[in-house]
């Protein structure tokens, strides 16, 4: 691969333990093949809150509140080689982790 290329990997998950485990797995895989890795860099957590009326009618005082937290991490693999790309393609991630890969 060209010297100026880098791979940017964005991870998203609802569980921070799961995303941290897979971020470290990607870092180990990339370092094993001789690539330089920057990250994982934690991005701001997106918190969505929902308020639902518990009462079937009229009682506005009875409400439940729920929230979902979306955790995000960014990894940059600088100067990847062919072995790095092959190793990352063979890596199987958990079902709860969303992965976006961009080659720049």
Swiss-Prot record:
Superkingdom of origin organism: Bacteria
Single GO term (MF): structural constituent of ribosome
GO cellular component: ribonucleoprotein complex; ribosome
Keyword annotations of the record: Ribonucleoprotein, Ribosomal protein
Pfam families, alphabetized: Ribosomal_S10
UniProt GO BP: translation
Annotated InterPro entries: Ribosomal_uS10, Ribosomal_uS10_CS, Ribosomal_uS10_dom, Ribosomal_uS10_dom_sf
Family matches, as HAMAP family: Ribosomal_uS10
Similarity section: Belongs to the universal ribosomal protein uS10 family.
Quaternary context: Part of the 30S ribosomal subunit.
Function per UniProt: Involved in the binding of tRNA to the ribosomes.
NCBIfam families in the cross-refs: PRK00596.1 (NF001861), rpsJ_bact (TIGR01049)
This protein's name: Small ribosomal subunit protein uS10
Gene it is expressed from: rpsJ
